[in-house]
């Protein structure tokens, strides 16, 4: 699903050059994500970092005739990570291990938490003003990890920290179009809450399909919430949702850059430091946000919910609060 903003990414003119860094560029998400960013004409300086493979990916992409320069960095060279990050405008973090059959996003926490923490610390040192887009799962916990690291370093800017939840929205659009036999490019489904299982709440009642039968709706909601499992199973242990996630990450990155450029009405969902349920001890929440030159301009209210969605929200908040606390406590304990 390409929004108007996403389509504008492929225009041939560049008004503002942006430096973008991908941390974990050699992985299953990192490689296709880097390709899509190479094709985005808002990006003129693309830096790719990984423990291995980043230089090969960068060389491969450098043959594509777009107006961006691409360079790979590894920890083997002096200041490799620092040079990949220095003065960059945007950092995308898809680094970490992928899900395997039987694993949940939370099962990834033990491995990915330390990876994200260390990359956040490096970003705080070398690119304290950059927008940070967290893709590494579990996003419900890794975003709070990044926030806590930035706070400890004294450079936390809640307007520039994003958990990328776009995949939930594009899945919702695609899946609802299959059920209702509509054009998926014309579907827009607000998905709120978090980015795993029951914390994912697609607001079907706010679409044109509110009269869908209960059975259809329940099946649709479950598929949106657990769509990642569908891919993990289909790949038979060989990976997770890498290609669709790369598309989602590139789509959201383009939206952030469009906001930086001052384009109007750039609205995308994201898991952010949010006031919506702070009074209940929930510091982060996914909802539509308006993006502008300084990052988040406005966090939109979730609107009117059906009774079913209200019930889903209550269950979401219980789980989400624990997920967030898990991330915060991880940083505090180290």
Swiss-Prot record:
Catalytic reaction list: (S)-malate + NAD(+) = oxaloacetate + NADH + H(+)
GO biological process assignments: aerobic respiration; malate metabolic process; tricarboxylic acid cycle
Positions of the catalytic residues: 195 (proton acceptor)
Transit peptide (first-last residue): 1-17
Binding-site positions, NAD(+): 24-30, 50, 112, 135-137, 245
Coiled-coil zones: none
Mitochondrion as UniProt keyword: yes
Binding of substrate, residues: 99, 105, 137, 171
Location of this chain's protein in the cell: Mitochondrion matrix
A GO CC term attached to the entry: mitochondrial matrix
EC numbers, comma separated: 1.1.1.37
Keyword NAD: yes
Pfam families to which the protein is assigned, alphabetical: Ldh_1_C (PF02866), Ldh_1_N (PF00056)
Primary location group: mitochondrion
Residue numbers carrying Phosphothreonine: 199
Enzyme class: oxidoreductase
Family statement: Belongs to the LDH/MDH superfamily. MDH type 1 family.
Subunit composition and interactions: Homodimer.
Protein name: Malate dehydrogenase, mitochondrial
Organism in which the protein naturally occurs: Saccharomyces cerevisiae (strain ATCC 204508 / S288c) (Baker's yeast)
């Amino acid at each position: 699903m390409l929004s108007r903003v996403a389509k504008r990414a492929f225009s041939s003119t560049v008004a503002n050059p942006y430096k973008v860094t991908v941390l974990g560029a050699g992985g299953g998400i990192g490689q296709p994500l880097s390709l899509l960013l190479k094709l985005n004409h808002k990006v003129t300086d693309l830096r790719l970092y990984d423990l291995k493979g980043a230089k090969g990916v960068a060389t491969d992409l450098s043959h594509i005739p777009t107006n961006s320069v691409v360079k790979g960095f590894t920890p083997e060279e002096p200041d490799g990570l620092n040079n990949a990050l220095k003065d960059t405008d945007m950092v995308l973090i898809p680094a970490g291990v992928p899900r395997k059959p039987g694993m949940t996003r939370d099962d990834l926490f033990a491995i990915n938490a330390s990876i994200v923490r260390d990359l956040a610390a490096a970003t705080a040192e070398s690119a304290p003003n950059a927008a940070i887009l967290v893709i590494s799962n579990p996003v419900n916990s890794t975003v709070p990890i990044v926030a806590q690291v930035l706070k400890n370093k004294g450079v936390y800017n809640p307007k520039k920290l994003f958990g990328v939840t776009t995949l939930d929205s594009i899945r919702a659009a695609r899946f609802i179009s299959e059920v209702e036999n509509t054009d998926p490019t014309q579907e827009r489904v607000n998905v709120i809450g978090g980015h795993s299982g029951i914390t994912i709440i697609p607001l079907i009642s706010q679409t044109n399909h509110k009269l869908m039968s209960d059975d259809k709706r329940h099946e649709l909601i479950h598929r949106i919430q657990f769509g990642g499992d569908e891919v993990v199973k289909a790949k038979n242990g060989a990976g997770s949702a890498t290609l669709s996630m790369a598309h989602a990450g590139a789509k959201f990155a383009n939206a952030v850059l469009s906001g930086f450029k001052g384009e109007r009405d750039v609205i995308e969902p994201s898991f952010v430091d949010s006031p919506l349920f702070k009074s209940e001890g929930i510091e982060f929440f996914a909802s539509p946000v308006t993006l502008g030159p300084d990052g988040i301009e406005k966090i939109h209210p979730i609107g009117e919910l059906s009774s079913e969605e209200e019930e889903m929200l209550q269950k979401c908040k219980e789980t989400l609060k624990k997920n967030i606390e898990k991330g915060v406590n991880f940083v505090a304990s180290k």
